[in-house]
A protein has these predicted regions:
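An N-terminally biased module of ancient metal coordination in phosphate/nucleic-acid-related enzymes
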Residues: 2-86, 172-173, 177, 181-201
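A short alpha-helix capping/helix-coil boundary motif
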Residues: 14-18, 39-43, 98-101, 130-131, ...
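Short, flexible active-site loop motifs that bind/organize anionic cofactors or intermediates
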Residues: 26, 107, 141
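Divalent metal-binding pocket/active-site signature
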Residues: 29-30, 114-115, 122, 127-205
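Alpha-helical scaffold segments that flank or form the walls of functional sites
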Residues: 36-47, 100-101, 109-125
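Noncatalytic linker/hinge segments flanking ATPase motor cores
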Residues: 55-66, 91-93, 113-123, 130-138
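Generic hydrophobic/packing signal
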Residues: 77, 94-96, 128
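Active-site gating loops and adjacent loop-to-helix segments of metal-dependent hydrolytic enzymes
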Residues: 82-114, 152-173
């Protein structure tokens, strides 16, 4: 998400380029936190937020890289929660990454991911695709955060589908062979960690 804002005044006109929603290899991105910052700098970004899924482990590295690149950095994350049988992804910006409530809340959210990933591997094996769990794990730099995106990359690499979009359509959405329903922390239960966030909300898949 790369956006720009134009500022105009009596004596000046300026454009601020910002990206406030990006992921690194700490969750399901393909670039390290440092590489994310370097990519943003090469594209003229002035303000950058790293918002990995349910993780803040990449913030310190990204913050150092941003200072080196002259980019204003915003600590962020993207929390996964359940509300009325719907999964929501809450993007928090300007967070307190040392907040005990936030750290504990994200740890609880992450705790079910590995079990879900194993069930996804078993489900895909029953559909004739073997070694999916181990294959997906090769794409995950953070073993605590194995996601559907990592399974998608494995399936594309193995030639089972043409691209990630087709993976989700054929295997990783409700009713498909590799989909495993997961209930995240309830929206109400996640409230305790929100004191560390200034957030906006968007629906998630």
């Amino acid at each position: 998400m790369l956006e720009s804002i134009n500022f105009t005044g009596s004596f000046m006109t300026a454009q601020l380029r910002y990206d406030l929603h990006c992921h690194s290899t700490v969750s399901d991105g393909t670039l390290t936190p440092t590489a994310v910052v370097e990519r943003a700098a090469s594209r003229g970004v002035d303000v950058l937020a790293l918002t990995d899924h349910d993780e803040i482990a990449g913030l310190a590295e990204a913050r150092v890289a941003a200072a080196r690149s002259g980019i204003e950095f915003v600590d962020g994350t993207e929390l996964s929660v359940s509300w009325r049988d719907i999964t929501l992804h809450i993007v928090g910006l300007g967070i307190d990454s040392e907040s005990p409530a936030l750290v504990a809340g994200m740890r609880a959210i992450r705790s079910g991911r590995l079990g879900r990933a194993r069930l996804m591997g078993e489900s895909l094996a029953r559909a004739g695709i073997h070694g999916a769990f181990e294959g997906a794990a090769r794409f995950a730099a953070n073993e605590q955060l194995l996601s559907r995106t990592h399974f998608a990359r494995f399936l594309v690499e193995g030639g089972h589908v043409r691209d990630v979009r087709e993976v989700f359509k054929r295997y990783l959405t409700p009713g498909k062979p590799g989909y495993v329903e997961h209930v995240w922390a309830a929206l109400a239960d996640a409230y305790g960690c929100w004191s560390a966030l200034r957030f906006h909300r968007r629906p998630g898949p």
